[in-house]
Amino acid sequence: MSRRGTAEEKTAKSDPIYRNRLVNMLVNRILKHGKKSLAYQIIYRAVKKIQQKTETNPLSVLRQAIRGVTPDIAVKARRVGGSTHQVPIEIGSTQGKALAIRWLLAASRKRPGRNMAFKLSSELMDAAKGSGDAIRKKEETHRMAEANRAFAHFR
């Protein structure tokens, strides 16, 4: 048995303007090459665009988008007896949110458009409505888990 203690789970900090942890998680995932101020700029411009287009609280649109994209179940490759099976596993809320944010950013990067703030705002609004690439990715993951339900006992 290891003598080393377990690491304490860090609490997610909130961003300076909206005091929201989801915004901070989004900023940390969009971050490239340590340019955090640029990441904040992109997020805040995207939030402003959402507010202009929907004329509602942009944070509620963000929450709704992330809630819509968050998967309940995913598949994990597990090697059993020489063959690899895709085993469906349940996902916790924190890991689900992290996956949702990753999928939203990947989908917005793929979009054609002017700049990242525009693409991110469009993807967030689409996800809040229940469409877009990120929602498609979630549905695809759920379909994979459903198709491989027979291997659930390998968990």
Curated annotation (Swiss-Prot):
CDD domains: uS7_Chloroplast (cd14871). It is found in: Plastid, Chloroplast. GO terms for cellular component: chloroplast; small ribosomal subunit. GO terms for biological process: translation. InterPro entries: Ribosomal_uS7, Ribosomal_uS7_bac/org-type, Ribosomal_uS7_CS, Ribosomal_uS7_dom, Ribosomal_uS7_dom_sf. PROSITE patterns: RIBOSOMAL_S7 (PS00052). Pfam families: Ribosomal_S7. Keywords: Chloroplast, Plastid, Ribonucleoprotein, Ribosomal protein, RNA-binding, rRNA-binding. Coiled coil: none annotated. GO terms for molecular function: rRNA binding; structural constituent of ribosome. Its main location: plastid. One of the primary rRNA binding proteins, it binds directly to 16S rRNA where it nucleates assembly of the head domain of the 30S subunit. NCBIfam families: rpsG_bact. Part of the 30S ribosomal subunit. Belongs to the universal ribosomal protein uS7 family. PANTHER family: RIBOSOMAL PROTEIN S7. This is Small ribosomal subunit protein uS7c. It comes from Hydrangea macrophylla.
